[in-house]
Every structure is written in C-alpha cells, then in structure tokens.
Amino acid sequence: MQHKHIRNFSIIAHIDHGKSTLSDRLIQHCGGLSEREMSAQVLDSMDIERERGITIKAQSVTLNYKARDGETYQLNFIDTPGHVDFSYEVSRSLAACEGALLVVDAGQGVEAQTLANCYTAIDLNMEVVPILNKIDLPQAEPDRVAEEIEDIVGIDAIDAVRCSAKTGIGIEDVLEVIVRQIPPPEGDIDAPLKALIVDSWFDNYQGVVSLVRIVQGELRKNDKIKIMSTGVVHQADKVGIFTPKATDTGILRAGEVGFIVAGIKEIHGAPVGDTITLARAPADAALPGFKKVKPQVYAGLFPISSDDYEDFRDALAKLSLNDASLFFEPESSSALGFGFRIGFLGMLHMEIIQERLEREYDLDLITTAPTVVYEVVTTDGETLYVDNPSKLPPVNSIDEIHEPIVEAHILVPQEYLGSVITLCVDKRGVQTSMTYHGKQVAVTYELPMAEVVMDFFDKLKSTSRGFASLDYNFKHFQTAEMSRLDILINGERVDALAMITHKDNAQSRGRDLVEKLRELIPRQMFDIAIQAAIGNQIVARSTIKQLRKNVIAKCYGGDVSRKKKLLQKQKDGKKRMKSVGNVELPQEAFLALLKVGK
C-alpha cells in the first residue's frame, strides 16, 4: 500500500454524540466484520464500557475502502474516549493521526468536552473535519449547529457531512470526506525504524500488546526491537493490524497503525509514548512522547477482610498493566488495617477502577474519602505535597497550605446560566470570563479542585438539566485557609475518617458528618461519643445512647439502697466495658463521607 493511499484518523465527540455507533457503521460498510460478528459498540471491549455506554480505552481498526475514484484506501481509525477523566487517552490517540472527525449531535450542538479535544487536535496541526450526526432525530437542527460550530470552534462547517449513524444515512459521504480531506501520512520507509507506542495492554497469554503508529521505517516479524527509553531489546513475535480482530500481517510500514507483541512481561517494559526502534539500526533520537499523567484525586482502598490483601495487591498490579495512569502505594490505617493509597484522574475513573476490582477480581473494598494534593509550606521553609489527611503536619508547624486550583470551562444554554453561576459561587469559584455564542454561553471559572472532584459534575448536570458541559485542567496552587477535620469516636481519632476542608465549611461539614455517623453506627452496651475536631478544638458532638437492661425489675418494694446498689453495679460494669470495648464502624460510615454536603 502506497503512502498516498493511507489515511489515519480518529473521532472526537462529546459523550453520547454517537461516536461508537458511527465507528460500528464504518466497520460494517468496509466489511471489517461479518454480519454474525457485528455487535453494538464493537470497539468497547470492556463490559463496563458497554454498560455505562462510555469508551474508556483507545482501540484501533484498519479498514480497506474502495473509494468513488476507483482506488482502494487503507483507513486506520483510532477510537477515543469522550469523558473528561480520560482526556489524556484522547491526546495520545490524536498524536498517532493526521486528521480527526469532529462529530457533533445535530440536536444538542457543541459541548465543552468536544471543544477541549478539538483544540488539542488543532494544536497538533491536524485536519479537523466536522460531521453532523443524528440528523434522523425530530429535534435535529443541522443549520443552527453548523453555525454554532463555526462560531465556537472556528472551523468552516457549512458543507459539513450530515449523517445518521443509527440509520446508516450518509455513511459513504463520511468515508469520502476522510479520503478527500485528511492528508496522507509522511514518513520515509527506508529511514531507521521509529514507532510510537500509542497504547499498551496486557494479554494473559501473549504478554504486553502494544498499539503502535509507525512514523518511519518498517517493522517485520522476528525483528529484534529496542525500546528507546530503557534500551531493552526484545524480539517481535507478532506484527499485525486490527480489523477489529487481531490479524497477523508480518509487516508494518511507515504511516501504518498496528499492533506488536514481543513477549514483554510487564507494562512498564513498553511505556506509552515511548519509541520503538530496531536493535541493528537504531534511530538517533526518540519521538516526542506524551506528557506524564498526574493523578488528581487520591483515595485509600482497603479490603474488608484482611485475608484479601495479597489478592488485592495482585489485582492492582494487573489493572495497572492496562491502565498506565493508575498510581498506588501501600498504606495502613489503625481503623481499616492494610490497604493501598491510589491516585486517580477523577471521580469517574475512581468509580470505574473500584467497580473493575470488585467485579473482575471479586474483592470487597472500603473506600475512604477522596482528597486532592495540597502543597504545604512548613515553618522550617520546607515544601511538602500531601495527598492524605493523616499525613498533614501538626497545626503549629504549618506556615501555609496551598490548594490546587483548576480552570473550568463550562458551556451552558442561556436559560440555565443563573443556576450554574450560583453553583460555582457556592463552590468558592472566581469567574474569569464569559462569552455568548448564539444560544450557548461559555463561562470560565477558577475553582478549587477539591470542590470539583467531590460532586461538582453531578450538581452541574442537575442544575442545568443535563445541558451544561464541563472541561477542566489544573492551573496552579493558591494559598487557602484549609484545616484538617478529625473525627473522634470515644476520644480516639479515626484516621480513615479525617478530611481536609476549607475553614469556612469546616464546622458545617463536621456537624453533618457527626449526625450522619450517629445514624449509621449501631447502638452498643455503652455510650459512644462522636466528636468532630479541628486541631484541638471540638466543633461538633453527638452521643449514641447505650442499651441498658432494667436491673431493678426484680425488686418488689423494699429498700431504696438495694436499688442503688444494683444501679451502681451496672454503672461500674458499663464503665469497665467502655474502657475495653471498641466500636465497629460499618462500611456505610465511610460512604457517608463521600456524601457529606450534598
């Protein structure tokens, strides 16, 4: 296949704008799978992806398309996720392509996510081709949306292809546009091999499978390859393409996208964004990779029974083979025993990882409240980064705490603007800009990341009836009055319930939490005092009353001193119980933390 007949592209779209369905149609049209093997969302290979209807991992397909000009073109299509937590997956997929289809729902118009990914594509000098999907819907307004694309994104969209992935209208026009408008790849077949690792995942039988884009040179089966960052040499056992099924071709040439299996045992052996070259004729310099992804949210995960700790560790190691962005380190808590502190990209990522651990590895887990990373300057002038409330230094040795601030871009229809602004102000946000585009308003806020990761996304969706969309990225650290809220049960601090919160909200948060715990902790044979403290100051308290037996029921009349003696005896017994008894915290108590302030 010559260079000029290859097209590499990916699809950018907001969640639910019909990206996966469109890719299904393209595969069907080019005969990539027989009718029998066709299933909805072919490229979403995880069960969770199908159930939640979202795409998490990037996947690729190679299709052959016979165009109207009689030539046969090879289309390499890399699927991308649309959710804000997975935007790094998108930037990787885009780096392997020359063009992108910007798919917009003709009923809903442009959304913030689409915009963010679209700018990523434009920064990479890619050709962006607008496509209006779902034109079969009664509420579709293709002309208005075409204007909106021009107004907000700034691409000419008058002659954008109009199609309906569900009914199959206009699919051929989409393929023609890909062939006509997206440029062919550049790259010299005779130069030394340079291949970019776009994604890697772990296969139980073959080891690491890497999705690669050959930038220059060619790669054949049985070649000795070298990973440039580590310098380790492997042998390429299998080389081929996905038609969505993995098909061995034995060779990949410059400009093509395919997979390579080289018997690598662990994922860090083929890090994403790395360059592969030949051992016998290595390239002189590596390709510019991707920026490392930093976890934004940290939470502790603990197995409910401590016997599962080993299995939990193995499960995490296996998951991190597939998810390069997962970060974890062992942690122990006096309340919950041994577990791990895990870093996530956002709340959706956290939910999905927890669900995969419970579903695929059959574990029962407790999650502590998620926290973000704070920058703490101590009185000695040292700077620490704290992601765990229990690691915060004592109050008297802290000079100042800086909290992470994100820049949030929100696109919202005009009628919901007021409620969105109120929400942002409640979350301690500062508005930096506001522009009107037709019926939509684009607002930019600087918000504390701690507020965004807790429940901001859900609240934004509910105040705007699901129409507002959000994209955010970390901006800088800013001084803030933060303090640690501790929960004491019978005078003992429970490390797993601690949280870092803003001074203004600390008291109300403490009160809410104490009330919640009071409802959740079962009554015992002795009084349980639940307190919320900031430093040494108690801000809220509640008591769970003891259960007591009626010890004087057996006395009929008689002397009062007899009753006193029995009551005193009961009191002493309760006191003794209290000094040795400990309170079992139910799983719901930890979940209550996540829901505080709702």
Swiss-Prot record:
Residues 4-186 form the tr-type G domain. Required for accurate and efficient protein synthesis under certain stress conditions. May act as a fidelity factor of the translation reaction, by catalyzing a one-codon backward translocation of tRNAs on improperly translocated ribosomes. Back-translocation proceeds from a post-translocation (POST) complex to a pre-translocation (PRE) complex, thus giving elongation factor G a second chance to translocate the tRNAs correctly. Binds to ribosomes in a GTP-dependent manner. Signal peptide: none annotated. It is found in: Cell inner membrane. This is Elongation factor 4. It is an enzyme of class 3 (hydrolase). PROSITE patterns: G_TR_1, G_TR_2. It comes from Pseudoalteromonas atlantica (strain T6c / ATCC BAA-1087). GTP binds at D16, H17, G18, K19, S20, T21, N133, K134, I135, D136. The lineage of its organism: Bacteria, Pseudomonadati, Pseudomonadota, Gammaproteobacteria, Alteromonadales. GO terms for cellular component: plasma membrane. Belongs to the TRAFAC class translation factor GTPase superfamily. Classic translation factor GTPase family. LepA subfamily.
